């Protein structure tokens, strides 16, 4: 109801897993065009590394992770690439999240955006300097 333009295109559920802080959301999407698991995962991996939402979305494709690995994550969600299912226009994504600390971090990000306040992150990047000749 909050996003009427997504009516009939998105359903989802969230499962509380047996840890104090971590849950998983399962998104069932209907896309406009056919896609493959590799295309989706490549796109989501790149978004998690190089886009403006990289502080919000992370990507993992390791069979070694367990739910407690995500406790304390600042990300809004961590896409589980191994669980991605793509079948034509139908896509299922599994997204882990810390439903306490991660949620709190997202509230802070939303408030910063609403107030147009973006505090610096530390450590600040050092300006590049030219190396001395012969070094």
Could you tell me what each predicted segment is?
Residues 1-91:
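C-terminal substrate-binding/catalytic lobe of Rossmann-fold NAD(P)-dependent oxidoreductases
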Residues 71-135:
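NAD(P)-dependent Rossmann-like dehydrogenase/reductase catalytic/cofactor-binding core
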